[in-house]
Amino acid sequence: MYYTEKKSFFEYIRNINIELEEFNLKLTVIGFWGGYPKQNAASSGYLLEHEGFRLLIDCGSGVLSKLQNIIQPEELDAVLLSHYHPDHIADIGVLQHARLIQGFLGKKNSTLPLYGHDMDPYEFSKLTYKEITKGVAYNPSEILTVGPFQVSFLKTDHPVPCYAMRIEADGKAIVYTADSSFKDEFIEFSRNADVLLCECNFYGHQNGKSAGHMNSIDAGKFAQKADVKQLILTHLPHYGSISELITEAASEFTGIIILAEEFQSISL
């Protein structure tokens, strides 16, 4: 790109910055509520972008609607699913139909790969739809390559089979816990991550272990022991004052803590 008299200097700089951003590892929160979305919001969904590749992590209720504020459904390159609870996959069906309709309108879309585990054969089978999407089973014991991303997995403690993910690209690492109560294996799995996207379904005085979830104290201790650079609390409860979750987590973790918010973006 070259600066010309027809292009203002500021527009030139802006376009350079946009081009450079494509080479950063960028995380954008699409939805973050646990269980179900609040009014005009979404449950679990996170967009990762790097080198022009767009990967959606989980696709819960409301995610497709919110995603269209950033990109269109046909612009996705892949989807990666942690497990098959509705608050993480509810919008898979409408994503499939969106791409189907775009095809009817003359837009040529390649088959979209939907990566998921095959420990639930019925749910996994629904990931394949006509020539629109193709379910691809990941092997949790192996590193998965999706576009520019290298993904490793850790089975979580949750009522159904569920996998946490460590997603790496160009020396940067984001760990997404998905749904789980705390387990010691998380520490090494998350060691020195740039971002820990940690579920926080309960307040510090509540015990979420039997439900397969963490509370704010669990998240803080986890982040401190793993020596992560930044903790993002997500999968948030629908009651109480959620700002208290930061205060409670900060009693254990001395680093940066933020609550997940709609369209919140972090570039690494």
Task: Cite the ranges covered by each PLM segment.
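Short internal beta-strands
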Residues: 110-119, 232-233
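Cap/insert and terminal regions of metallo-dependent hydrolase folds
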Residues: 182-265
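Conserved beta-strand hairpin/beta-sheet module of binuclear metal-dependent hydrolase folds
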Residues: 20-71, 162-178, 195
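Catalytic core of the metallo-beta-lactamase
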Residues: 136-192
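Polybasic, lysine-rich low-complexity intrinsically disordered segments
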Residues: 6-8, 15
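Active-site metal-binding motif and surrounding structural segment of the metallo-beta-lactamase
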Residues: 62-111
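Active-site neighborhood of phospho(di)ester-bond hydrolases with catalytic His/Asp-centered motifs
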Residues: 56-60, 77-83, 87, 175-180, ...
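Metal-dependent catalytic neighborhoods of phosphoester/phosphodiester hydrolases
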Residues: 91-99, 126, 241-249
